[in-house]
């Protein structure tokens, strides 16, 4: 194992164009180390602007093996008005991933947030069903064969484990889940189909229990759910990282073929906390990978909490080095 001590140097990224820098980064790729332990990927999120940032892009290219579009594949970005699709941002990420041999997790097809008003205003069941089907089919067929997995539905549960109140549940009840997954399976039969949510960080929490119960029921009914994604946004006042393994084990108990940590960030980014989550995934056989929600703290949605593996100057933190050393 090549350790990553060199990444601690304050001059590491002084010349990102240098092939020597890229070589050193690649020799200590967190993705390569994780895959060597039998997992599919260790990835991050990005989009066009970040991939055109040379400092950010060099790290993505050298150190991560999977990309999730942070915003470019959400409904408001792809279909802002009915039947009018805008693929520029999503195409950029998909093309980058193909060129650089990165897996892609598509994110996300059906979500109550970042949803155009024209969708939110639908009240007719048949209309909403057709809108969901057309949206999913159009997007998934465009990227068929390029997207390893899709977050088909995202954040559909309340904290008590019941279905979230949204236009989808209001108009269609829980049947929108079946509609979405069946449409997705038909559009790209080889893509892994996920249900994704946050606060699934304790096996004993009501939301986790609700997810487990509903997914078991839907699987028994033949809904083609392949995986459960746990976003894993950890904060100082939230769930302890010590519950990660138990939570992933509970999610895996539903019978899905895969579980994954899909949007990991940890307030303070301590080495111990990151290692706890990495070890949790390593210890749960069906946990296929980890995606951290960004590269540098500078670009994080929680930048003030310094939650990522690279600081605001694109320097690898102790947590990154600790993971490499442990692997």
From Swiss-Prot:
Pathway: Glycan degradation; xylan degradation
GO cellular component: extracellular region
Summary of pH dependence: Optimum pH is 5.0.
Compartment(s) where it occurs, according to its Swiss-Prot or TrEMBL record: Secreted
Keywords attached to this entry: Carbohydrate metabolism, Disulfide bond, Glycosidase, Hydrolase, Polysaccharide degradation, Secreted, Signal, Xylan degradation
Disulfide bonds: 281-287
PROSITE patterns, alphabetized: GH10_2
Matches recorded under InterPro entries: GH10, GH10_dom, Glycoside_hydrolase_SF
Active site residues according to the UniProt entry: 155 (proton donor), 263 (nucleophile)
Temperature characteristics of this protein: Optimum temperature is 60 degrees Celsius.
EC number(s) stated in the UniProt entry for this protein: 3.2.1.8
Transmembrane helix keyword on record: no
Superkingdom classification of source: Eukaryota
Chain ranges of the GH10 domain: 45-326
Region forming the signal peptide: 1-19
SMART domains, A to Z: Glyco_10 (SM00633)
Function per UniProt: Endo-1,4-beta-xylanase involved in the hydrolysis of xylan, a major structural heterogeneous polysaccharide found in plant biomass representing the second most abundant polysaccharide in the biosphere, after cellulose.
UniProt family annotation: Belongs to the glycosyl hydrolase 10 (cellulase F) family.
Name of the protein this chain belongs to: Endo-1,4-beta-xylanase F1
Species of origin: Aspergillus oryzae (strain ATCC 42149 / RIB 40) (Yellow koji mold)
Gene that produces this protein: xynF1
């Amino acid at each position: 194992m090549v350790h990553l001590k060199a990444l601690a140097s304050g001059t590491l990224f002084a010349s990102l164009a240098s092939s020597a820098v890229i070589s050193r980064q690649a020799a200590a790729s967190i993705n390569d180390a994780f895959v060597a332990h039998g997992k599919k990927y260790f990835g991050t999120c990005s989009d066009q602007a970040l991939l055109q940032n040379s400092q950010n892009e060099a790290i993505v290219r050298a150190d991560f093996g999977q990309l999730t579009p942070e915003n470019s594949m959400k409904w408001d970005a792809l279909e802002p008005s009915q039947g009018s699709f805008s693929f520029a941002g999503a195409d950029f990420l998909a093309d980058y991933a193909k060129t650089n041999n990165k897996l892609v997790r598509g994110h996300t097809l059906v979500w109550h947030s970042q949803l155009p008003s024209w969708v939110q205003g639908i009240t007719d069941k048949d209309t909403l069903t057709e809108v969901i089907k057309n949206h999913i089919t159009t997007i998934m067929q465009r990227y068929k064969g390029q997207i390893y997995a899709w977050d088909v539905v995202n954040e559909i549960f309340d904290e008590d484990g019941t279905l979230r109140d949204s236009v989808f549940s209001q108009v269609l009840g829980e049947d929108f889940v079946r509609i979405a997954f069946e449409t997705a399976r038909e559009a790209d039969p080889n893509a892994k189909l996920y249900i994704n949510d946050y606060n699934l960080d304790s096996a004993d929490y009501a939301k986790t229990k609700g997810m487990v119960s509903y997914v078991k029921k839907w699987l028994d009914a033949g809904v083609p759910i392949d995986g459960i994604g746990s976003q894993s946004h950890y904060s100082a006042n939230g769930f302890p990282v010590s519950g990660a393994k138990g939570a992933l084990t509970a999610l895996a108990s539903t019978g899905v073929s895969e579980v994954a940590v899909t949007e990991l960030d940890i307030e303070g980014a301590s080495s111990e906390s990151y290692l706890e989550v990495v070890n949790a995934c390593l210890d749960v056989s069906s946990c296929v990978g980890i995606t951290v929600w960004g590269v540098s703290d500078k670009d994080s949605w929680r930048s003030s909490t310094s939650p990522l593996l690279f600081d605001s100057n694109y320097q690898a933190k102790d947590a990154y080095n600790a993971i490499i050393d442990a692997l």
